[in-house]
Amino acid sequence: MTQNILFVGGAHLERSVRQRLEQNGFAVSSVSASAPAIQVLTDSLIDLVIVHLDERQNGTDLIRQVRHVLGTKTTGVLAIADWGTGLPSVALAAGADAYEPAPIVPERLIDAVKRVLHKRATVVGMNK
């Protein structure tokens, strides 16, 4: 079964990263801002939200909104941010399941995506 990923952030999701995720069986969509992300989340079945944080946007508010809108649904949240900015800690405190440092390295991102999805499935008893 294909798992759906929503990438949110001002930073452009590189074509090579998208292709690598798709080659690993993930369907990837992307939006650049919080408002369309919340709309996608309410209208679609999304398994994982990847939020690319930077200091110009308040992606941590999006993480809180995702948790509020989805409640106890199984959707995971993975934050990407530059180390040393404090954003990784803030993202985890806001409800992100995991953090990956920027810049995005495809292999590392794929491993993180799989870990978060596995963890979320285990939490809700879907992974036997």
Protein language model regions, located:
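Two-component/phosphorelay signaling modules centered on CheY-like receiver
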Residues: 11-30
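Acidic, metal-coordinating helix/loop segments flanking the phosphotransfer/catalytic sites
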Residues: 32-48, 55-56
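Conserved phosphotransfer cores of two-component systems
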Residues: 42-44, 67-73, 94
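Conserved phosphotransfer microenvironments
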Residues: 47-70, 84
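A short, hydrophobic beta-strand element within the central beta-sheet of small alpha/beta folds
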Residues: 73-86
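The C-terminal output helix
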Residues: 114-128
